[in-house]
Amino acid sequence: ELTGSSKPKGYKFDGRSIADLLKPGAKVEWADRFLVTDSQRVRDPIKWRKSSVMSQRWRLVNGEELYDIEKDPGQEKNLAKENLQQVKKMRAFYESWWAELEPTFAETTELHVGHKDHSVVSLTSHDWIQEVGTPWNQGHIRSKSPLRKGKEGKHLGHWALKVLKTGKYRIEVRRWPSESGKAINQELEPGGDVPGASKAFRAQVGQGIEARSATLRLNGKDLQTQAVRSETQSIVFETQLTKGKHKLSPYFSVPEGELGCYYAIISTP
């Protein structure tokens, strides 16, 4: 709309255009409406989990608590019992919103590789799919998460890939990002701390992992294994990938068991 482009045929936009609101001096009639926000942070969405249905005036929190945000921006007084009709209306909107989205929950968001315009794809552990929480920040990665002391670990996460073209692919796996210049088994020295309520991730020591080898696991099968030497920064595998869906889960063999490779770079040779 802002660029003058036409809408793709059959495409349904979600929401309402704010283009008119962006015009200098515009006076736009803007009807009150409901919006939904939630914070799931789980693999499979849970109804009403950490949710809020919002209007200009009202906030319905977790489907149970109602606050008048204009008079009570701190959300201290729950008015649900005094405004049952408002709660009912906002719950009905959420139910409709959930019903529209629920059929998509079983769909996996896949990372595309093999596209002619993107011959190199970089992956990080943030996109692992697994039952337990993924190591999504440097605090996790520096501390070898999700390994636990005294417990033999097995790498249970995977990257969901959609291979667009059958062929031979180069898969480079790393413990540290390539920009670090660090070897797989090398400790990462802490950086300077920054002001804040807690210790910055960069101020933590990046632990050595004592990896003996790296293994390429694809669709639950271990295909190749290579030794990790003291100076090795990355391990490179070459393998044939067929067009379609795949689960990629390379790992390092460490004293505690299996530690997923936090970084991978996939390219066509």
Pin down the residues of each PLM region.
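A short aromatic-rich beta-strand->coil structural motif
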Residues: 1, 54-85, 89-90, 125-131, ...
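C-terminal cap/loop subdomain of S1 sulfatases and analogous C-terminal strand-loop tails that border
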Residues: 1-71, 86-89, 104, 116-117, ...
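Catalytic cores of secreted or luminal carbohydrate-active enzymes
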Residues: 3, 69, 83-154, 168-170, ...
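Short beta-strands within extracellular/lumenal beta-sheet-rich domains
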Residues: 141-163, 179, 234-237
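A short beta-strand element within beta-rich, extracytoplasmic domains
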Residues: 163-206, 248, 252
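Short beta-strand/loop motifs in extracellular/secreted proteins, especially
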Residues: 167-169, 210-214, 260-262
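Surface-exposed, short loops/turns at beta-strand junctions within beta-sandwich domains
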Residues: 240-244
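Exposed low-complexity, polar/acidic, P/S/T/G-rich flexible segments that act as propeptides
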Residues: 253-269
